[in-house]
A protein has these predicted regions:
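An aromatic- and glycine-enriched ligand-binding surface/loop that stacks and positions planar moieties
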Residues: 1, 86, 90-97, 109-171
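Conserved, well-structured interaction surfaces
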Residues: 1-56, 80-84, 93-107
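Flexible, active-site-adjacent loop/turn segments at secondary-structure boundaries
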Residues: 6, 54, 59-60, 75, ...
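Glycine-rich, histidine-containing beta strand-loop boundary motifs that form or position
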Residues: 45, 50-52, 63-65, 151, ...
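Short coil/linker segments at helix-helix boundaries
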Residues: 58-83
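Short, glycine/acidic-rich hinge or "gate" loops at secondary-structure transitions
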Residues: 62, 106-110
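A broadly tuned preference for mixed-charge, low-complexity surface segments
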Residues: 66-67, 71, 102-103, 168-171
Length: 171
């Protein structure tokens, strides 16, 4: 039970931080750098909601930040429908796909490829085969990724190889 609670709390903490970043960006000058930051926050939020939905099914959606000023305000949380959850996931990932570069010089950052991969995974969950295929084909056509020899895939010396769309940089 403690691992389940840990996952639930952690995912909603990530979602909360993402909501804060997304909301704060609304008051700033629109720049490519800001759009990239918001895109990464939306990727974290989409990934967290996808993991929560796959694990628990009945989850609540929160897209508003919870600063100290409104922490005690009443909110109407209810179990979101599958459509509501995946509409938000798709919306967040579409924003990221539009605003992120295909690759990053900083290993472990969300990129357009990672956002497309997450959208393909979400589409698989929904049996949305056309969207799945579209996302995977776009990754393949990008020219940034390719298969490598099997004995190199899990070589600890270089996990950030051309087959990896995104590698978390911690263990």
């Amino acid at each position: 039970a403690s691992q389940v609670g840990f996952m639930w709390r952690t995912m909603y903490q990530i979602i909360g931080k993402a909501n804060e970043i997304i909301a704060a960006a609304e008051d700033l000058e629109d720049t490519p750098s800001l759009r990239a930051t918001v895109s990464e926050a939306k990727c974290f939020r989409a990934q967290s909601y996808f993991l929560l939905y796959r694990t628990f099914d009945r989850i609540w959606l929160n897209i508003q930040p919870t600063p100290a000023e409104n922490v005690n305000d009443p909110r109407d949380f209810h179990a979101a429908s599958e459509k509501e959850v995946f509409d938000l996931i798709y919306e967040d990932l579409e924003y990221a796909i539009t605003n992120l570069d295909w690759v990053s010089d900083e290993a472990g950052r969300f990129t357009q490829a990672a956002a497309r991969h997450m959208k393909a995974k979400a589409a698989l969950w929904l049996k949305d085969w056309d969207t799945t295929l579209e996302q995977v084909e776009e990754i393949e056509k990008s020219g940034h990724f390719d298969l490598i020899a099997l004995n190199e895939v899990f070589n600890a010396r270089d996990l950030n190889h051309k087959e990896a769309l995104m590698v978390q940089q911690w263990s």
